[in-house]
Amino acid sequence: MEKQKKIALINDLTGFGRCSTAVMAPIVSAMKIQAVAVPTAILSAHTQFPTYYFDDYTDRMKEYIQTYKDLKLDFDAISTGFLGSEQQVDIVLDFIRHFKTDRNFVIVDPVMGDYGKLYRTYTKEMCDKMKELVHYADIITPNLTELCTLLDAPYPENGASIEELKEMCGKLAERGDRKSTRLNSS
């Protein structure tokens, strides 16, 4: 009997806005992979909306994750998304150190901002922590805003050429032992 594939989805659950675990879990499930959620927050709408409810799960994450450790779960992949605090990055780093093996991979979507602006929940300290987290990624999926932030580069208001984007992705890839850096939009 073939082992059930599992991916840890370390991300928020957002009610409105077509993002987060609400989008990831059905896609992963359709691929016959078990989506194992690790919630970082619950939001009524994503943070680009002018108003939203934000319930930070930082204080609950360690106990939540401990259950997975006690069950001796293993994962075929670990995927991170929206993180709501510096402490959450540390919790995620511990998760990766515990569950990462030579048979799985880590995907980090930095989820820091869009269109040249960081989300309101992001601070300089959070950006520094995200720079630490991406070192553990096999695959990074930043958008242009996040790529510039991770590289401490100015956001190109008029866009960037394919060559400039390749160069930026290459610089980010050099900062860790990873398989791939893929650029999303924004």
Positions of predicted regions on the chain:
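Conserved phosphate/ATP/ADP-binding segment of small-molecule kinases
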Residues: T121-S186
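Conserved N-terminal subdomain of the carbohydrate kinase-like
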Residues: E2-V108, M112-R120
